[in-house]
Amino acid sequence: ELKKKKFDKVFIFNSSLRYFLISKLAGIKKISQYPLFKKKDNIVTSAKIFTENELGTIVSTQAELQLDKLKVTNIKSQFSKDLKHICLGISASGPTKRWSIKNYINLCEKIDKQIPSKFYIAAGKNDKELINEIFKSKIKNKCISFDNLKINETMPIIKNCDLYIGNDTGWLHISSALNIKCLALFMDSPVQAYGKYSKNIETILPEGETEETTTHDTLGAEKISFEKVFNKSIYLLVIFMFLRFICC
């Protein structure tokens, strides 16, 4: 298939010999690739260095998603100004990367008591059991789920949120790219790769771990301090309220 396309050049954001050989067999003459056989690299740093070398200019790792302004404004008009609006990222690529749903429910209840809020549950159809737990809880009437929405339909909603709180998942990175302040819980994935590339992301790590030691196979979900998550959430919401006040 690649050979039929008659590509002139390929950029391979990977150190795999397999991709190099596939490109050669496809007849692609110009092959730009990471150094072969490189292991344990930081995927963000490696991509940045590679891209800068290819383009000959400095590039930012700060992703930015642009949305239709009218759609964002329409959603904003539906948001109550008396509430804080929080995107809650309960989903993840696997159970070891998810904080307990009971913790999230407890967190929502405590936040809402201190700062009246509405929660937007960033999860999909595969997270139905987790979503059901939330909608069986005391906080259910303050929640809206994304499970029946397409990702592009959720973005104007997220864009109007005051804060993202949740696991290291796709919703985190979408929220960050929409310039939303994010509180990300890292328990079984590399902080230095996924939590340091954006000014919008603040992290909570398992007790006893550091940014260097929190990586794949850390298995630290049970060591995420509830009080730290709660206190940091309140702090970020209060800071946001203060900044909005002085800006107005």
Regions found by a protein language model. Give the residues of each.
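Catalytic machinery of carbohydrate-active enzymes
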Residues: 1-248
